[in-house]
Amino acid sequence: LLLQTLLPALLHADGLSRLRLEGGTHNPLAPPFEFIDRVFLPALRRMGAEATVSLVQSGFAPVGGGVIECEIQPCARLAPIDLHERGDLASMSLRVPIRNLNAGIGNRMLAAALDQFPCEDASLEIREPGPGRGVCCLYEARFENTAELSSSFGESNVTAERVGRRAAKNLQDFIGSQTPVGRHLADQLLLPMALAGSGS
């Protein structure tokens, strides 16, 4: 969440800001990198902000070691955003990033998620060699006006199947609820919406 903390100040900088952030990019206690890239920043762009992130190296908790690079353009004023309607479902995708673990674990997680909530765009992603090991299930839904990403992380004494089903069930429940935004996006947009003023 370091990026979200720095972002409001950097939007008011005199010029382009470049950041290199190191630590945990995939941590069960916070939304993963993909959430920032695929859910949070697209919502912020609708408010007039221009920011991009790239994943140099993923860092699974508890070891971390991940690296993210960011570019943030100055923005004199954020525009209000209306998120009362999420619009029609446009696409879904399922990814299972895994590092330094047997690929069979990831494949079991993928299969269980698909059994719970089918999706045509699904794949296992073997991450580059690096510190630590880990696996997670990332299930994304994109709508006309917003997006949601459900994440579930591998943990000791929890089967891969349970992790996969949990991510799929959470997204399935979100889609069925007709809620316009997920709880993580709602939390992270509070400050930008306050800065944008009335209308958000």
Question: What are these regions, as identified by a protein language model?
Answer:
Residues 1-21, 39-48, 86-93, 163-167, ...:
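Proline/glycine-anchored alpha-helix kink/cap motifs
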Residues 74-76, 141-146, 195-198:
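Short acidic-glycine loop/turn motifs at beta-strand connectors
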Residues 113, 199-200:
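Short, intrinsically disordered, charge-balanced linker/junction segments flanking boundaries
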